[in-house]
Amino acid sequence: MNSILERIAKHKLEEVAVAKKNKPLHVLSKQQPGEIRDFITALKSNTSPAVIAEIKKASPSKGLIRKDFNVAEIAKIYTQNGARCLSVLTDIEFFQGHPDYLALAKSKTTLPVLRKDFIIDSYQIYESLVLGADCILLIVALLDDVQLMDFCQLAQELKMSVLVESHTQDELERALRLPTPLIGINNRSLHNFKTDIQLSIQLKQFVPKDKIIITESGINTREDIKLMQSHGINAFLIGESLMRADNIGKALQKLMTD
């Protein structure tokens, strides 16, 4: 049986082919991007946990996560309650996201915004810029080394930051070859969706000190954050635990303060 990641990649190729027909690259690239915000500096400033708060309606492994899903309202709440950056799921088929959600969230916040999607074609990088992304996600498991370098350099030429995500030591080594300081360690396997937050602690030893480690998936409690901070990890991408909360603002504050 194909892994979830393989199914997503196959569908994404079809999706991008349709997008290119509907709006060819020469048309897309003429659209004027808006203001680009500094994602990297936002994660560096001060000593409190640097939370990238995620706007996510559903996932392939968990199904519907938040029924009452108002992108504009969630973006405002995250902004008012101490998030450093936002992450917005734009995948339609598997995560019930939408590219329009990114543009909407960006219009409701002063924070930098990450486009969380499965990038397999340079077209999506130009699209991300037009939608208002300040940072894109590149997933090592999805791309070869040439694609990773080309996509990373293209995004940076367009003035966006790049978060490169790995799940294994081998993937991490490939990620570290790229000219970006943002190193994501996904504690959840994109092949079987099993989660283990110890993975970030295990892989941290291989990451140079000039990089910013972002631990992703499975960070659900204040104790999880304190554990990571005790091992020198201070940036967190958090979605599901916030999206499941009745009071999103309080849930975010609770993660960040004793």
Curated annotation (Swiss-Prot):
Q: Which InterPro entries match?
A: Aldolase_TIM (IPR013785), Indole-3-glycerol_P_synth (IPR045186), Indole-3-glycerol_P_synth_dom (IPR013798), Indole-3-GlycerolPSynthase_CS (IPR001468), RibuloseP-bd_barrel (IPR011060)
Query: In its keyword annotation, does this UniProt entry include Transit peptide?
Result: no
Q: List this protein's GO terms for biological process.
A: L-tryptophan biosynthetic process
EC number annotated for this UniProt entry: 4.1.1.48
The entry's protein name is Indole-3-glycerol phosphate synthase
**Involved pathway(s):** Amino-acid biosynthesis; L-tryptophan biosynthesis; L-tryptophan from chorismate: step 4/5
Q: Which cysteines are joined by disulfide bonds?
A: none
Q: Which domain of life is it from?
A: Bacteria
Q: Which gene encodes it?
A: trpC
Keyword line: Amino-acid biosynthesis, Aromatic amino acid biosynthesis, Decarboxylase, Lyase, Tryptophan biosynthesis
Enzymatic reactions: 1-(2-carboxyphenylamino)-1-deoxy-D-ribulose 5-phosphate + H(+) = (1S,2R)-1-C-(indol-3-yl)glycerol 3-phosphate + CO2 + H2O
- Listed Gene3D superfamilies: Aldolase class I (3.20.20.70)
Question: Which PROSITE patterns did the record assign?
Answer: IGPS (PS00614)
One GO MF term on file is: indole-3-glycerol-phosphate synthase activity
Native organism: Legionella pneumophila (strain Corby)
The entry sums up its family as follows: Belongs to the TrpC family.
